Amino acid sequence: IPGGRTKVKNVKTDTEIQQLGSYSVDEYNRLQRTKKTGAGDLKFSQVIAAETQVVAGTKYYLKIEAITKGGKMKVFDAEVVVQSWKHSKKLLGFKPAPVDK
């Protein structure tokens, strides 16, 4: 389906996906520090699920495990767009993932 999302296979061993997850956490931390909100002390653990979507570049939807300052493992949803021809990537969104019941 053009414009639809595609699930990424073998996420835990996909180096590019794991690097995008690490970038997402680092960028979130950097943005939080510039806002001086007191947040932004997450430590990347791993991407546990990912989907891609072709837009003006490739948009990645990542489910990321990160460790909080207090040592708790939490799951976050991140959106990153990569435009390889411009050598650019941008974090579009980063928030706690909804808790599955």
Curated annotation (Swiss-Prot):
It comes from the Eukaryota. One of its GO terms (molecular function) is cysteine-type endopeptidase inhibitor activity. The keyword tRNA processing does not apply. PROSITE patterns: CYSTATIN. Strong inhibitor of papain, ficin and cathepsin H, B and L. InterPro entries: Cystatin_dom, Cystatin_sf, Prot_inh_cystat_CS. The lineage of its organism: Eukaryota, Viridiplantae, Streptophyta, Embryophyta, Tracheophyta. Signal peptide: none annotated. This is Cysteine proteinase inhibitor B. Keywords: Protease inhibitor, Thiol protease inhibitor. CDD domains: CY. Gene3D superfamilies: 3.10.450.10. Belongs to the cystatin family.
